Amino acid sequence: MENVVFIGKEIRRELKRQGRSGVWLARQLPCSNNHVYKLFSKKTMDTDLLWRISDIMDVNFFRLYMDKWERRRRIIQNG
């Protein structure tokens, strides 16, 4: 079972679902468009930045990690 959350891909997917762009996110953060597009290719991210993005987009991206952790714990407990 894969236990990795590819956070950049998840953020890009959610932006698309919300009908928003990387340019929009760059304005909200604020940072360069280039920086945001580089974030999309990252598997990991600083927690402060992820917190800011979660707040801006009104999405708890930390839940992705918690869901993976809970599934892993269930597998371990159930043998």
Question: Can you name each region flagged by the protein language model?
Answer:
Residues 1-20:
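A short, Lys/Arg-rich alpha-helix, primarily the initiator
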Residues 19-20, 45-48:
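Residue-level signal for the short linker/turn that defines the boundary of a DNA-recognition helix
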Residues 48-63:
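DNA major-groove recognition helix of helix-turn-helix/homeodomain DNA-binding modules
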